[in-house]
Amino acid sequence: MLPLVIKLSGKALAAENELLTLFKALQKARRPFILVHGGGVEVDRLMTDLKRDVKRIDGLRVSPAEDMPLIAGALAGTCSLMLRGLAVKAGLTPLGLVATDLNLSVVRPQDARLGRVAKAAPGTETAARRLLALMETGLTPVMSSVGIDDEGRLWNINADDVALAVALLLKAPLIFLSDVRGVLNADKALIRELTPHAAQKLIAEGIISGGMTVKVNAALAAAAATKAPVAIASVFDETLTHCLLSGKLPGTVFAS
């Protein structure tokens, strides 16, 4: 069984009770999964406490080299340990990783104005085999959006990008888990499945708009690239665990 790749948004990361319920359900069902997370809120809090500037360009955090030890500490330290603590409480055996461990992904630097900000490209087939072998021993990977390049330098990677790189590597289903339960139709009812054609029609009609347009296009691109289903769902959805345990994806599912 291919593992689920579950990417947690900032809102989902803070939903400790809901995550604990999810982890317990997945542990009981022995459903393998990989958690991918960022932690922008925690980074902002740390920078503010230390009176460091928080700057963004086109919505992306400027991450100077001198700030990377702090950013990495918040992401791969504070946020990762919180999630791993919940996993332990749920009876799981978590394995803390950064995005590039085991060569699971490769750093691809972005705009130099952003400093140490990068995208993630999928790693090697050997890396995929290593990860799956570790998971077969009962480990649950908890992967932060920190990367290390060939020179040993730290990079800040968008967590969505890390999740996509891992899903691409494994050809695995991907869930973007946030506080948004999925795509709604004109009557505000959840749309359970969307094809590229149907999604573009809803965008043209203005039913999908604003930030949801970005999420939908990202999900469609991910589904097309991985050839596996991709879902947008809410950690607060009461049907979340039932869907996963019955072999379905929650929220709105995008097919390639």
Region annotations inferred by a language model:
Residues 1-256:
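C-terminal catalytic "cap/lid" subdomain
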